[in-house]
Curated annotation (Swiss-Prot):
Pfam families: CTP_transf_like. Its EC number is 2.7.7.18. Keywords: ATP-binding, NAD, Nucleotide-binding, Nucleotidyltransferase, Pyridine nucleotide biosynthesis, Transferase. Pathway: Cofactor biosynthesis; NAD(+) biosynthesis; deamido-NAD(+) from nicotinate D-ribonucleotide: step 1/1. Gene3D superfamilies: HUPs. One of its GO terms (biological process) is NAD biosynthetic process. Catalyzes the reversible adenylation of nicotinate mononucleotide (NaMN) to nicotinic acid adenine dinucleotide (NaAD). This is Probable nicotinate-nucleotide adenylyltransferase. It catalyses: nicotinate beta-D-ribonucleotide + ATP + H(+) = deamido-NAD(+) + diphosphate.
Length: 168
């Protein structure tokens, strides 16, 4: 299994790295694939350029054996849609099982993403629980994605508390 960790990484920080290490170990993943966005559809424009964010990511991850960087979205340019990236990665890795890593705040907007149900066919979801968000996430699933089965289609990960968020 490979874990896909998409984000703006503007900038990449120790919280991203600690989370990726912890999730990789917890799920016994082959690797964590960092996918920096070119431009996220639901976020403001980035402060750093795509190339600068990619370079920062390369520097931050250079000593991490189980981490790779996929620059597909940056090479593709334009608005980055996860569904296209997952299709690309499925082809690249021969259909190997993919798990999409999402913070609970991002997951609560998942119904607004391009082709969310297609994404669910391409990857299983790992939701990183934020303090006090689990009930909200469970209600959200009941409302928007009642077909998701815990520990089959969607997994919840409660790791160490790291008080760093790119959305705050």
């Amino acid at each position: 299994m490979r874990i896909v960790f998409g984000g703006s990484f503007d900038p990449v920080h120790v919280g991203h790295i600690i989370l990726a290490r912890d999730v990789c170990e917890h799920f016994n993943a082959k690797e964590v694939i960092f996918v920096p966005t070119y431009q996220a559809p639901l976020k403001e424009k980035h402060k750093a350029s795509a190339q600068d964010r990619l370079n920062m990511l390369k520097l931050a991850l250079e000593r991490e054996e189980k981490f790779t960087i996929e620059d597909y979205e940056i090479r593709r340019k334009g608005i980055s849609y996860t569904v296209y990236t997952l299709k690309y990665l499925k082809e690249k890795y021969g259909g190997e099982e993919l798990y999409l890593l999402l913070g609970s705040d991002s997951f609560l907007k998942f119904h607004k993403w391009k082709e969310p149900r297609e994404i669910l066919k391409l990857a299983k979801i790992i939701v990183v629980e934020r303090e006090g968000m689990l009930e909200k996430v469970k209600e959200y699933i009941k409302e928007y994605f009642p077909e998701l089965r815990k520990n089959e289609d969607i997994f919840f990960y409660k790791g160490r508390r790291i008080d760093i968020s790119s959305t705050e």
